[in-house]
From Swiss-Prot:
Keywords tagged on the record: PQQ biosynthesis
Gene assigned in the entry: pqqA
Protein's name according to its UniProt entry: Coenzyme PQQ synthesis protein A
Role noted for this protein: Required for coenzyme pyrroloquinoline quinone (PQQ) biosynthesis. PQQ is probably formed by cross-linking a specific glutamate to a specific tyrosine residue and excising these residues from the peptide.
Organism: Methylobacillus flagellatus
Taxonomic lineage: Bacteria, Pseudomonadati, Pseudomonadota, Betaproteobacteria, Nitrosomonadales
Gene Ontology biological process terms, A to Z: pyrroloquinoline quinone biosynthetic process
NCBIfam families assigned to the protein according to its UniProt record, in alphabetical order: PQQ_syn_pqqA (TIGR02107)
């Protein structure tokens, strides 16, 4: 992912957090 849009970054961050919580 080479996007530099803040919206995309926020979405990706939220997605990573969700995956982390699901993997716990």
């Amino acid at each position: 992912m080479m996007w530099t849009k803040p919206e995309v970054t926020e979405m990706r961050f939220g997605f990573e957090v969700t995956m982390y919580v699901c993997n716990r």
